[in-house]
């Protein structure tokens, strides 16, 4: 569930959603124009308030996971991005504490970071309380590390799935674009997966079912060869 900032104050809406949402729920916290490290103190304060309120709303919905962005502006160099890491880890202290209190797992998603190495210090600073969410389209379109491999080395426990033409963040169905999910996604099918597509998701669901079937077939072959 994306927590649209334009609707975040609507109490009746969240009460209705809570009754209608079945099973496990994950949310995406607000991110537009937010940055805990903005040079503008007003933006820093607003960012903290929106993240904390978003976590409160997540708990109201019964969500067990909440994804957020680091807020890094697009086009930062690896050196600039790395310089942000420890200050960001410190600025996240109150957010991590609120998530812990509410019982919501906090997940940092790659967005405009140039490379995965700049996220590692943040994740390590809050080890055990902050996980990683991987979005392959963001890596391909926004970063200087388009290959999923280095990002997957961060050990994502949550993945946002969609496809892209490699130029824009299209949110296409899986298999329609250039991300090659069949080449790398199979070992992560046991993690929490969220489809983020802007079209009928049936094609993506069929893709995932077929990929899972290929994995089972390969596993069965290994068992047969081991006998």
Q: In which residue ranges do the predicted regions lie?
A:
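N-terminal pre-domain/capping segments
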Residues: 1-53, 59, 221-227
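Acidic-and-aromatic substrate-binding clefts and catalytic sites of carbohydrate-active enzymes
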Residues: 1-13, 35-37, 74-76, 110-117, ...
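Acidic (Asp/Glu)-rich catalytic clusters
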Residues: 8-29, 53-62, 96-101, 121-127, ...
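Charged helix-capping and loop-helix junction motifs
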Residues: 11-17, 43-51, 81-93, 143-151, ...
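Active-site acidic/histidine proton-transfer and metal-coordination neighborhood
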Residues: 37-131, 219-223
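Histidine-acidic metal/acid-base catalytic patches
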Residues: 116-131, 140-227
């Amino acid at each position: 569930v994306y927590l649209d900032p334009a609707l975040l104050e609507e109490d009746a809406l969240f009460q209705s959603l809570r009754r209608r949402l079945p099973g496990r729920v994950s949310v995406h916290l607000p991110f537009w124009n937010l940055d805990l490290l903005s040079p503008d103190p007003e933006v820093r304060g607003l960012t903290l308030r929106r993240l904390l309120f978003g976590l409160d709303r997540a708990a109201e919905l019964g969500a067990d996971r909440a994804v957020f962005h680091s807020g890094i502006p697009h086009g930062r160099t690896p050196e600039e991005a790395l310089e942000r890491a420890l200050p960001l880890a410190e600025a996240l202290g109150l957010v991590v504490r609120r998530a812990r209190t509410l019982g919501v797992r906090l997940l940092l998603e790659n967005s405009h970071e140039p490379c995965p190495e700049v996220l590692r210090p943040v994740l390590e600073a809050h080890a055990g309380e902050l996980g990683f969410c991987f979005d392959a389209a963001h890596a391909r379109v926004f970063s200087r590390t388009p290959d999923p491999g280095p990002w997957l080395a961060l050990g994502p426990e949550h993945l946002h799935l969609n496809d892209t033409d490699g130029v824009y963040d299209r949110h296409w169905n899986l298999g329609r674009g250039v991300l090659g999910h069949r080449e790398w996604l199979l070992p992560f099918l046991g993690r929490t997966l969220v489809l983020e597509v802007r079209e009928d998701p049936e094609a993506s669901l069929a893709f995932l079912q077929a990929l899972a079937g290929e994995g089972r077939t390969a596993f069965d072959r290994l068992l047969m060869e081991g006998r």
